[in-house]
C-alpha cells in the first residue's frame, strides 16, 4: 500500500474561500457569516419600527392613533399588531390582503409582522455572531448561550403567544405604552403575577441585579493596588493587564456577613450567569403555557368563602376581583371590533362597595 504525504490544494479562486476571507477579515466592525443574517434583519426591523412609529396609523386595526404624525410622542407611539380578522396571516406585501399596495399593507398592520419576524431573526443572528467570534478567538460560547434567554422571551411573547391565541392581534404592539397595555392584559386575562413561571422570572432578574451589584461593589472594595488619586475612578488604571483585587479578602468578608461565600471565581461567575438566564427561560416557558391558556395558581376555596361571607376577603380574592374588572373594562376598549357592551350590573365590585 502506498501512502502519499502532501497538502490538498483547492482552486485559488474558490468562491467560498473568497467570501470567507472577506467576511471574517479583521476590521473595525466584524461582519462574519452571521452578519449576513444579522445586519439585513436588524436594518429592516429597526427601519420598519421607525417608519411605523413616525407615519403609520392604527385606526384600521385598533381604532387608535399610534404615530408621531398623529400627535403621539415616544412613549405612546407604536407599531401596532394586525387586525384580529387577519388571524395568523404573514401579511406579506405581495399577499392576498395587501396585493402589493404599500399603503394598504401599512393600514392592515403588515409592518408589525415585518418587524417581529425580522427582529426575531436579527436576534438569532446576533447570537450566532457571538458563537462565530468566540470560535474565532477560541473562547467558550457562554455569551451566546446567555443571549439565548432574551431571545426565548422575545420569541415566546411576540410569536408563540399570539400563535396560541386567535391571531397576531393579541401580541404586544412595538411601543412603550403598548407594552404596558399588554402587561395589564396578561394580568387581567391570565393572572400572570400568580403564575409560578413569572415568579421564577422575577426571582432571576432581580436576583441577577442583586448579584451584579454585590459583585461589582466587592471587587471595588477589595482592590489592593490603588493609585494616589482622590477617588475610586482616578485611583486605578482601567486598562491594567493584571488582576489587582483580593479574592481571599472578599471571601473572608462575605463569610463573616452571611456565613457562606464563594471560594472560587468560576463557581461565582457561573452562578451569576445561571440565575438570570434560568429566570428568563422560565418566564419564556410560562408564556408558552399562556399561549395554551394554562392557568396560574387558583385558590378556589378562598373564592367560594369570599362569595359566601361578606366579611372574608384576602389579597388573593381582591386580586381576582381586580382581574375581573380588568377583563370587563378592558375587553370593550381593547377589542372594539367585538362591539362588547357590559351592563353596569355585571361589572365586578369588591365587598367594600
Curated annotation (Swiss-Prot):
Residues at which a plastoquinone binds: 215, 262
Modified residues (Phosphothreonine): 2
Ligand binding (pheophytin a): 130, 143
Subunit (UniProt): PSII is composed of 1 copy each of membrane proteins PsbA, PsbB, PsbC, PsbD, PsbE, PsbF, PsbH, PsbI, PsbJ, PsbK, PsbL, PsbM, PsbT, PsbX, PsbY, PsbZ, Psb30/Ycf12, at least 3 peripheral proteins of the oxygen-evolving complex and a large number of cofactors. It forms dimeric complexes.
Record field: catalytic activity: 2 a plastoquinone + 4 hnu + 2 H2O = 2 a plastoquinol + O2
UniProt-annotated binding residues for chlorophyll a ChlzD2: 118
Function (record text): Photosystem II (PSII) is a light-driven water:plastoquinone oxidoreductase that uses light energy to abstract electrons from H(2)O, generating O(2) and a proton gradient subsequently used for ATP formation. It consists of a core antenna complex that captures photons, and an electron transfer chain that converts photonic excitation into a charge separation. The D1/D2 (PsbA/PsbD) reaction center heterodimer binds P680, the primary electron donor of PSII as well as several subsequent electron acceptors. D2 is needed for assembly of a stable PSII complex.
Subcellular location: Plastid, Chloroplast thylakoid membrane
Protein name: Photosystem II D2 protein
E.C. number(s) listed in UniProt: 1.10.3.9
Entries under CDD domains matching the protein: Photosystem-II_D2
Root EC class: oxidoreductase
PANTHER family in UniProt: PHOTOSYSTEM II D2 PROTEIN, PHOTOSYSTEM II PROTEIN D1
Binding positions for Fe cation per the UniProt entry: 215, 269
Top-level taxon: Eukaryota
PROSITE patterns registered for this protein in UniProt: REACTION_CENTER (PS00244)
GO biological process, alphabetically ordered: photosynthetic electron transport in photosystem II
Keyword Cell division found: no
Family matches, as InterPro entries: D1/D2, Photo_II_D1/D2_sf, Photo_RC_L/M, Photo_RC_L/M_CS, PSII_PsbD/D2
Location, primary (coarse class): plastid
Membrane topology category: Multi-pass membrane protein
GO terms assigned for molecular function: chlorophyll binding; electron transporter, transferring electrons within the cyclic electron transport pathway of photosynthesis activity; iron ion binding; oxygen evolving activity
GO CC annotation terms, alphabetical: chloroplast thylakoid membrane; photosystem II
Keyword Acetylation among UniProt keywords: yes
Residues found modified as N-acetylthreonine: 2
